[in-house]
């Protein structure tokens, strides 16, 4: 990919998702805590996506539910050491934003980040709302993205003794819709609230804050952040392939091999979907039509390929491919990088 685009992998989205953990002796499972009242055995798949193409650059399997600066820097260093790709920008979810992360990535540091501010103690999440409350609804701060009207404003703040930009947003469509739903179900509860709290509830369900060391407009930064939704598509695709191995197969080597196989499958499906986007055809339909060509190998290594139907030829044509009548085994292995 870097031969085609030298910038591939330099700007990345990083996120993680829980893997199936129903098997007790999964070697990567670890006990992790969720708040004060629950704990769970968990393994997480960490994915790094190229921000331009949306394709996986790197993945790792981590025990438990560790989402911190060490995880991020380990990923950055592994990608640099193994692939020679220096990641220079990161888009992270709230689980990664911490005091240590802000200390490593703030205004003036070389690498850039965008992260979602957690709504928990130690972060000025609601404080920022009260600071800009009277500006919400003003046309000066309004913009539209994908049919949703947003309020957005940027403030330079100090977070954990480091300078950072806070981008404060209200998705006014979501805020109004979900506030209306809340009122229908909790009208009596709402009536009991203080006036100040009632004001907060009118925006609560559309309010969020992004932190970044990038100096941009609120609209520009939000577009950059929302591109990370690509990673959710990849996770959804990946989970369609990440089926559980048989109980007897759960070893370090087999789990790593299974995940590698599934990431390759995921990448292939994503590339196929990207190529098919304008065709109006589903990926499953094309795979179903094209996967059943029979092949016969002769003693001299020549592989004869079944003659495809007219419709199958058309499907291959959508990918810019033609079906050869014959293939040399040695040539084919070299083309796909297999050792002879």
Describe the function of each predicted region.
Residues 1-340:
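Anion-binding and metal-coordination hotspots
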């Amino acid at each position: 990919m870097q031969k085609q685009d030298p910038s591939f992998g330099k700007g990345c989205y990083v996120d993680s998702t829980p893997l199936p953990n129903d098997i007790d002796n999964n070697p990567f499972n670890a006990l992790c805590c969720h708040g004060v009242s629950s704990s769970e055995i968990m393994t997480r798949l960490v994915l790094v996506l190229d921000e331009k193409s949306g394709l996986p650059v790197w993945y790792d399997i981590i025990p438990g539910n560790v989402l911190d600066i060490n995880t991020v820097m380990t990923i950055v260093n592994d990608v640099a050491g193994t692939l020679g790709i220096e990641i220079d920008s990161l888009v992270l979810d709230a689980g990664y934003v911490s005091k240590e992360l802000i200390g490593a990535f703030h205004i003036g540091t070389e690498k850039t980040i965008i992260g979602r501010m957690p709504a928990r103690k130690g972060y000025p999440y609601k404080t920022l709302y009260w600071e800009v409350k009277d500006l919400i609804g003003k046309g000066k701060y309004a913009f539209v993205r994908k049919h949703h009207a947003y309020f957005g404003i940027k403030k330079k703040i100090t977070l954990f003794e480091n300078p950072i930009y806070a981008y404060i947003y209200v998705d006014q469509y979501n805020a109004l819709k979900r506030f209306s739903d809340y009122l229908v179900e909790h009208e009596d509860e709402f009536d009991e609230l203080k006036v100040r709290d009632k004001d907060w509830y009118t925006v609560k369900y559309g309010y969020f804050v992004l932190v970044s060391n990038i100096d941009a407009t609120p609209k520009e930064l939000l577009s950059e952040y929302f591109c990370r939704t690509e990673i959710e598509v990849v996770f959804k695709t990946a989970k369609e392939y990440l089926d559980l191995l048989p109980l007897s197969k759960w070893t370090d080597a087999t789990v790593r091999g299974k995940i590698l196989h599934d990431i390759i499958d995921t990448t292939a499906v994503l590339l196929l979907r990207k190529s098919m986007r304008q065709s109006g055809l589903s990926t499953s339909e094309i795979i179903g039509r094209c996967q059943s060509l029979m092949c016969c190998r002769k003693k001299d290594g020549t592989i004869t390929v079944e003659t495809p139907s007219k419709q199958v030829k058309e499907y291959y044509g959508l990918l810019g491919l033609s079906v050869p009548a014959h293939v040399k085994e040695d040539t084919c292995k070299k083309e796909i990088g297999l050792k002879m």
